[in-house]
Amino acid sequence: MTDSDCVLCAGREMDGVLLVTEVWSNEFWRLTTTTVGEIAGYSYLSTHRHIEDISALDGDEQESFGAVVWRTTSAIKEATGADHVYVYVMGDGIDHLHLHLAPWRGPTSPLVDDPIKGLVTR
């Protein structure tokens, strides 16, 4: 896959297709939140640079990673009233590093069932 074929590299151009909206970004990272779905505040943190996994982060991305994950999960927790914000790294569907940030609001949370809905294809 080239950067031009990547839906996450396209940035805001693909937000409508992906059903997300950008809520924050800096020079290395972009945070989007779902506009539809069972879990209010379900978000994605992705790199601006096209890389496929965490081991490909460069020095500046590595240095900012922990602080950015802490800031974004803290903001999601506060905004949604979640008890926890779980962080998942999965990339089978989109070959561009992105973290799933999933607010959890106790045992009645939709997250208990299955956070990622849809057809899984191989």
Where do the model's predicted regions map?
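HIT superfamily nucleotide-processing domains
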Residues: 1-122
